Amino acid sequence: MLSFVVGKRNIIAMETRQIIGRERECDLLTRICNEREARLIALYGRRRVGKTYLVKNYFEEKFDFFFTGSFETPVQAQLSLFRDALCQYTGKQYDTPKDWNQAFAMLRDYLSQIKKERIVVFFDELPWMDTPKSNFLSAFSYFWNSWASTLDGLKLIICGSATSWMIDKIIGDKGGLYGRVSHTIYIAPFNLHEVELFLQKRKGILWNRYQILQAYMIFGGIPYYLDMLDKNVTFAENIDQLFFKHNAPLRTEYEFLFRSLFKSSNVYRQVVEAVAKKNKGLTLSEIKTALKVGASGKLTEVLKNLCSCDFLRKYSEYGKKEKSAVYQLTDLYSLFYQKFVVGNNGRDEHFWSNISDNTRNAWAGYAFEQACLHHISQIRSKLGIQGVLTNVCTWAMDRKTDSDGTQWPGVQIDLLLCRGDHIINVCEMKYSQSEFVVSREYEQHLRERNNTFAHFTKTKDALHTVLVTTYGLKQNAYSGSIYTTVTADDLFER
């Protein structure tokens, strides 16, 4: 029998089951399982992020009932699979239910016979059960509201990769499930600290942090992709095998990823591909122009869903209104795929091993920036401002000439930490294979950029330049222009 007591025994059990990271999520599950009342728990997050793995391993697969939806499967076939699962758990034979209402009635009859203090039911890939004209959601709502919510000790866990569906239909539902979800648990991709633990403990891969950072910049913190790495070949050979060999698994993953997450997946792909073409991202107006579409609530919904599924991030520019917000591609796997895999059919199967240093470094510069933006918490920790109210934004300006002839350079600042103590950390994110060297020209660039920002924004806050770079800063006559340095090692902190 599972023990849910928080303490040393539970930690040891978690290590045995090889749950990497997820301490907060496991602690929350423990607390929920120690509650007497019935609970409806919704887990959501990007596909391949490890939602199913977490639930199965936390509970050691000891469920009183488990069922997973089947992708693009008609309702009658889903109901037949549900019948098979019920037969497996009860040891009895059942006819296939005629609809979901009957299926849940059969489940209710089975669960009501279980005499246990705690009953655990797990529905995985719930969105896939909600096929057209199946009335699944209304049947599920009735099952929970009319009976399951009254069964003390029941822990009903629902999970889905289609994050937008989970948020709209379950977590934010305005109908039968309004306010019924007891707990929502968002499963985020691993951070660098967790990627390092995963590679060492799960895969036995003892790469240095520079190599781990490169892996993160390609795969993001997605455990499913990281689990494909082979410790017996080099880093470059791993990338070739996974992306560029004939039938490489991550070459075909991209299309399935979108089809499994979104209806009308072509529209979602078109948006991602449009945004991917511009490193700084696109505004809503620019996306409409790129896709040649007019004003549409559908496009706004697509963008919202892509943000909720961790493909895009929406960020505001300093001092500008919401309508000027920019959408930027932040899913690192999609970024790498768009840059190197699209249109690569028939190319060298050892493409990554043979690619030029200039091409690789150009990509790495931008990918490193995105990796940094996924670790703002670690950057704030290094700066010692975790307890300071901080807004995260960006700022950009095209080259301008004033009426008096004064020329101002074009400026692009990818990360501003605007603090409540009237300090703005102006962050420079620079990928380097050694200590970063501030030249005279670069020092002048930083000075002109800060002056331009202060002049046009009219800010009275102090501007502190922060350098985020792989190996730190080489001291020289110009390094004093950097207020604080954050290294890759700092990004690996918890």
PLM features: residue spans?
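Phosphate-binding site recognition
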Residues: 1-354, 358, 465
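A cross-kingdom feature that marks ATP-driven nucleic-acid transaction machinery
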Residues: 318, 325-494
